[in-house]
C-alpha cells in the first residue's frame, strides 16, 4: 500500500507511523499480529459491524458506521472505558411523568491505562508533525 505523501521511511516506530499516516506499517503490523486480532480489538472497542479478517483491514476496507468509528476512539479520551452511548436520555409526558430513563451504567474498561497513555501520545503526534 502507498503511504500518505507517497514516501517510504524504512524502519520507524509505531508513533512515527501513526503521525505520518504510514499505511505500509499498519499493514505490516496487521500481518504480524494477525487480522483476527485486529477484528477482536475493533469489536472490543465498540465496532459492531461484521469485519473481514484479512490483511487489508489495516487500510480500512471493512465498512463501519460513523457512530461506531467515533465511539471506538472514546476509550482513549475516557481512561480506557468503552462509552455507554444513548441518544435519548429521558422521555417524559407533558405533566412530567417519566416514560423512559437511561440511567446508564458503568462502562467496561476495554483498554489498559498504560495503552491509553501511549495511544494518546501517538495521536497527539499526528497533529504536531
Predicted regions: what is each one?
Residues 2-78, 122-125:
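Active-site-adjacent helix/loop patches that line small-molecule binding or acyl-intermediate pockets
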Residues 16, 63-129:
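A penicillin-recognizing enzyme superfamily signal
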Amino acid at each position: 500500500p502507498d503511504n500518505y505523501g507517497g514516501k517510504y521511511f524504512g524502519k520507524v516506530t509505531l508513533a512515527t507511523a501513526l503521525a505520518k499516516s504510514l499505511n505500509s506499517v499498519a499493514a505490516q503490523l496487521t500481518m504480524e499480529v494477525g487480522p483476527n486480532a485486529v477484528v477482536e480489538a475493533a469489536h472490543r472497542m465498540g465496532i459492531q459491524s461484521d469485519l473481514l479478517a484479512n490483511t487489508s483491514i489495516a487500510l480500512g476496507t471493512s465498512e463501519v458506521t460513523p457512530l461506531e468509528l467515533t465511539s471506538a476512539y472514546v476509550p482513549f479520551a475516557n481512561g480506557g472505558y468503552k462509552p455507554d452511548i444513548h441518544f435519548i436520555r429521558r422521555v417524559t409526558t407533558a405533566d412530567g411523568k417519566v416514560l423512559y430513563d437511561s440511567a446508564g451504567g458503568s462502562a467496561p474498561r476495554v483498554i489498559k491505562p498504560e495503552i491509553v497513555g501511549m495511544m494518546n501520545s501517538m495521536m497527539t503526534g499526528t497533529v504536531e508533525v
